[in-house]
Amino acid sequence: MAGALALNTYKTVSIAVTTGLTTAYTAPNGVSSIHLFSAVSNISSGVSTVTVYYNKSGTQFELIKNAKIPTTDVLNPIVGSLVLEVGDKIEIEGSANNAMKFTMSILESAK
C-alpha cells in the first residue's frame, strides 16, 4: 500500500530552551500521540528555571512551573505517559536563552 502511514512511529524532539514560549511538539492529524519521556538539561554555569505546559485547545496547563535546575543537572518535567490528541501541544520557556535543552520522546500510532 503506497503512502500508508506506519502503524507505530517513534520520534524524538530536541530544542534549546529560550525565554520566549516555544512549542516543542504539536500532535498531528491521523495519529494518537503518547509522551514517553522528557528531560530538561541545564547546560549553563548557574541555576536555571523552566516551565513546561500542556496546551489543549489554546488553554495552557502548567505541568511544572518555575522549576529550578542546578548547573549541569537534569529534570524530568513529565513523569509517565501523557496522551496528546490532535492539535495538543507541549510548550516550554526558561529563565535564560540557551541555558537549557529539552528532549522529548513520543510514540505516534496510526488511527
List each model region and its residues.
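Surface-exposed loop/turn positions
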Residues: 31, 73, 86-88
